[in-house]
């Protein structure tokens, strides 16, 4: 009986600490010190929420920079979409020899070359043709952004030098100076572009 009471008291104490005090403490710290990140890093434009800095989007308008390929369509579907994958994130995990993967990459290459005249096949950065493990990657490499500058400049009338400045402004360095690579947040870049356009669909 003595051991039972001790175990019961210990269980109650742990429930209070781990199930109440700790979660409330972490929530309080998150909401006060990291409020934006704790709430999904939501990005606003013209007073409207237009996305998250942590989640990629499928930009098809030729006036904007495109992001990485997503095997789950960035988890955005219509009710009648026959291609709905029923998964929130992930990758197809297809082998390099898989025919479906080869066909998809070929289609993406042809599409990119068509919309970016002057670019050669072997100049297309790998991250514009491959999907991330989650299918929701919001970033591309600086090289992947810069190769799109001529096309975006032509579609928007914004000078290439100005677009390169925007890319530089939205480029983040390695985490802690050593982890990962330099990256450009596609949503943030496109919002900078949208702010310079008279008519933009972003946020409308």
Curated annotation (Swiss-Prot):
GO terms for cellular component: plasma membrane. Residues 81-100 are annotated as: Disordered. GO terms for molecular function: ATP binding; P-type potassium transmembrane transporter activity. Induction: By low potassium concentration. Keywords: ATP-binding, Cell membrane, Ion transport, Membrane, Nucleotide-binding, Potassium, Potassium transport, Transmembrane, Transmembrane helix, Transport. Its main location: membrane. It is a single-pass membrane protein. The system is composed of three essential subunits: KdpA, KdpB and KdpC. Part of the high-affinity ATP-driven potassium transport (or Kdp) system, which catalyzes the hydrolysis of ATP coupled with the electrogenic transport of potassium into the cytoplasm. This subunit acts as a catalytic chaperone that increases the ATP-binding affinity of the ATP-hydrolyzing subunit KdpB by the formation of a transient KdpB/KdpC/ATP ternary complex. This is Potassium-transporting ATPase KdpC subunit. The lineage of its organism: Bacteria, Bacillati, Bacillota, Clostridia, Eubacteriales. The gene is kdpC.
């Amino acid at each position: 009986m003595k051991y039972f009471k001790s175990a019961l008291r210990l269980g109650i104490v742990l429930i209070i600490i781990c199930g109440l005090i700790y979660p409330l403490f972490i929530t309080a710290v998150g909401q006060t010190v990291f409020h934006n990140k704790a709430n999904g890093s939501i990005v606003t434009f013209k007073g409207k929420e237009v996305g998250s800095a942590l989640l990629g989007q499928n930009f098809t308008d030729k006036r904007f920079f495109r992001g990485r390929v997503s095997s789950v369509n960035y988890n955005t579907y219509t009710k009648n979409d026959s291609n709905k994958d029923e998964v929130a994130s992930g990758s197809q995990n297809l082998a390099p020899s898989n025919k479906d993967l080869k066909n998809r990459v070929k289609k993406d290459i042809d599409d990119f070359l068509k919309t970016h005249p002057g670019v050669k096949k072997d100049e297309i950065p790998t991250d514009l043709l491959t999907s991330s493990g989650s299918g929701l990657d919001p970033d591309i490499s600086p090289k992947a952004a810069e190769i799109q500058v001529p096309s975006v400049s032509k579609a928007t009338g914004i000078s290439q030098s100005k677009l390169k400045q925007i890319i530089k402004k939205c480029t983040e360095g390695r985490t802690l100076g050593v982890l990962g690579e330099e990256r450009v947040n596609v949503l943030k870049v496109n919002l900078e572009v949208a702010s310079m356009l008279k008519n933009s669909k972003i946020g409308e």
